[in-house]
Each structure stands twice: as C-alpha cells, then as structure tokens.
C-alpha cells in the first residue's frame, strides 16, 4: 500500500523548489527560511524519516504544500507546472543513468566536506551546488527554460541560487521516487494526492 503522506511531502519538496526558482527569477530573492530548507535537504542523505530531509518538521514545507495544492487544483502558474514536471522528468533520466548517479553521489559527498569551511548559503557553496547541477543534471535532458526578469537572470549569484534550488528539487524528486511516487498517480490519483496535501497543510496550524 502506498504511503501517500510521504509521497506528498516529497512532491511538495519538488514544488517548493519550483516556487523558489520562480521567486528568484522574478524578484531576485526568495523566502530565506524556505531557501535554507531547500539547501539543507542536499546534506541529509540518510534520513530516519522523510521529515528529516526538510528540517524535521512539516511546517518547513508550507510553501511547497501551498504550491502543490494550487497545482493539483489546476489553479497554478503554468511556468511553475513546467518547472516541477521538468524536475520529475530529469529525475527519471538520472535514475536510468548509473554513472550520473554515482558521480552525483560523489560530488554531494565532497560538498558536505566543504561545510567545515563555508556556510551552506555562502556564495562559495552556492557556486559548488550550481556546478553540480550544471555538470551532472542539466546534460541529462531538455534544459529547463527559466522565465523572469532578464536583469536578475543575468546576475551570477541569482543564476547560482536558481541552479542550487533546482538541485534541491532533484533531491526531492529522487525522494519522491523512493517513497513510491509515480507520474501515473499525478494523472489518475490527483484527488487522493490533493486530499492528502490539504490534510497535511491543515496540520501545520
């Protein structure tokens, strides 16, 4: 039997990354706590439970749950839809590429070693995360075309933040697959996913 609670949390993580990408591309900034939740998820590789990946509490996925609920209600922004579905598609490519998976694991291990020297949200760490995405994930499939302000999208720091958040989105997409998530569920069990997302969201308050 599928654990829809965990599937929805992982999918909310994907949607949260998509929303952060949109914020960064259109405003050059994102909610700081939610941004850190995304970055921190890259460092939690052996969680005891799914909540551990997102700071140990469901409330850290509030923005992602809101975004997922709007998306499942067909009320969401089309760019957001494209972003999170593209992340799921890239995860599918990654799962079929053993070399890419191994390289990704090695690069994440080296990333974790840099914590001794740099804060997770430092420009140096963001650059490392962005390079991991560009080197390993981006070549796997069709590049995600990000729409936003050209002035912001030209800034190297904004570019690195977006790629770092996309890498976090891949982390959530991998988790979604591990929890038993499938694209068929999004098509045929949308109401179940929506009801579960609403139930989890209501528990935050």
Swiss-Prot record:
Principal location: cytoplasm
Task: Enumerate the InterPro entries for this protein.
Answer: HflD, HflD-like_sf
Q: What SUPFAM superfamilies is this protein classified in?
A: YcfC-like (SSF101322)
One GO cellular component term: cytoplasm
Enumerate the UniProt keywords alphabetically.
Cell inner membrane, Cell membrane, Cytoplasm, Membrane
Subcellular location per UniProt equals: Cytoplasm; Cell inner membrane
- What topology does the record note for this protein and the membrane? Peripheral membrane protein
Query: Would the keyword Membrane be found if you checked this record's keyword annotation?
Result: yes
Which Pfam families does this entry report, sorted A to Z? Answer: DUF489
State the similarity comment: Belongs to the HflD family.
Q: Which NCBIfam families match?
A: PRK00218.1-2, PRK00218.1-4
Question: HAMAP family from the xrefs?
Answer: HflD_protein (MF_00695)
Fetch the PANTHER family from UniProt: HIGH FREQUENCY LYSOGENIZATION PROTEIN HFLD
Identify this protein by name: High frequency lysogenization protein HflD homolog
């Amino acid at each position: 039997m599928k654990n829809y609670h965990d599937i929805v949390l992982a999918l909310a993580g994907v949607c949260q990354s998509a929303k952060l990408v949109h914020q960064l591309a259109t405003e050059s900034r994102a909610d700081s706590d939610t941004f850190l939740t995304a970055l921190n998820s890259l460092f939690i590789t052996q969680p005891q439970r799914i909540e551990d990946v997102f700071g140990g509490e469901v409330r850290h996925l509030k923005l992602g749950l809101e975004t997922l609920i709007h998306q499942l209600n067909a009320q969401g922004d089309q760019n957001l839809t494209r972003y999170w579905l593209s992340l799921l598609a890239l995860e599918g490519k990654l799962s079929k590429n053993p070399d890419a998976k191994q390289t990704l694991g090695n690069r994440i291990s080296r990333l974790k070693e840099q914590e001794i020297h740099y804060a997770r949200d430092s420009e140096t760490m963001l650059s490392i995360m962005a390079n991991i995405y560009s080197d390993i994930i981006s070549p796997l499939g069709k590049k995600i075309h990000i729409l936003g302000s050209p002035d912001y999208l030209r800034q190297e720091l904004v570019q690195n933040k977006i790629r770092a958040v996309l890498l976090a989105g891949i982390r959530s997409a991998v988790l979604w697959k591990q929890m038993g998530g499938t694209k068929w569920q999004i098509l045929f069990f949308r109401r179940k996913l929506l009801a579960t997302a609403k139930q989890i969201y209501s528990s935050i308050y």
